[in-house]
């Protein structure tokens, strides 16, 4: 037990050494039996199964189906500078 004026030093615990073979086994089993639940991954997989490339966010040829919140605007894109 410590006295009122002396702070106790925290006890530092050392980690056990990690073997390279343990790391290899852990990396392989991280997502072994888990389905990826990302919307981006789902869209990419759907386009891949359809045999086409997924639309890019940088493409000017959007269809309006890439996002639910924004529909394509009529006419050419306006400049942000003028």
From Swiss-Prot:
Q: Where in the cell is it found?
A: Nucleus; Cytoplasm; Secreted, Extracellular space
Task: Say yes or no: keyword Cytoplasm present.
Answer: yes
Q: What are the record keywords, sorted? A: Chondrogenesis, Cytoplasm, Myogenesis, Nucleus, Phosphoprotein, Secreted
Q: Using the UniProt record, give the first listed, main subcellular location.
A: nucleus
Which residue intervals make up region (Disordered)?
A: 1-37, 51-82
Transmembrane intervals: none
Q: Which domain of life is it from?
A: Eukaryota
A Gene Ontology annotation in the biological process aspect, one of them, is:
chondrocyte proliferation
Name positions with the PTM Phosphoserine: 2
Where is the PTM Phosphothreonine found along the chain?
6
The record's tissue-specificity note reads: Expressed specifically in the musculoskeletal system (skeletal muscle and tendon). Highly expressed during bone regeneration, especially during the early phases (post fracure days 3 and 5). Expression within the fracture callus is localized in osteoprogenitor cells of the periosteum, proliferating chondrocytes, and young active osteoblasts.
Residue numbers covered by motif Nuclear localization signal: 10-18
The keyword Protease is assigned to this record: no
The cellular component terms of Gene Ontology attached to this UniProt record, alphabetical and capped at eight, are: cytoplasm; extracellular region; nucleoplasm; nucleus
Q: Which family does it belong to?
A: Belongs to the MUSTN1 family.
User: What does the function comment of this entry state?
Assistant: Required for chondrocyte development and proliferation. Plays a role in myoblast differentiation and fusion. Modulates skeletal muscle extracellular matrix composition. Plays a role in skeletal muscle function. Plays a role in glucose homeostasis.
Q: What is this protein called?
A: Musculoskeletal embryonic nuclear protein 1
């Amino acid at each position: 037990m410590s006295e009122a004026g002396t702070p106790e030093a925290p006890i530092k615990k050392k980690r056990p050494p990690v073997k390279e073979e343990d790391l290899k086994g852990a990396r392989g089993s991280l997502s072994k039996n888990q389905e990826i639940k990302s919307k981006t991954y789902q869209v990419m997989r759907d386009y891949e199964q359809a045999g086409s490339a997924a639309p890019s966010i940088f493409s000017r040829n959007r269809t309006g189906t890439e996002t639910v919140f924004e529909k394509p605007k009529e006419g050419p894109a306006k400049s942000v500078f003028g």
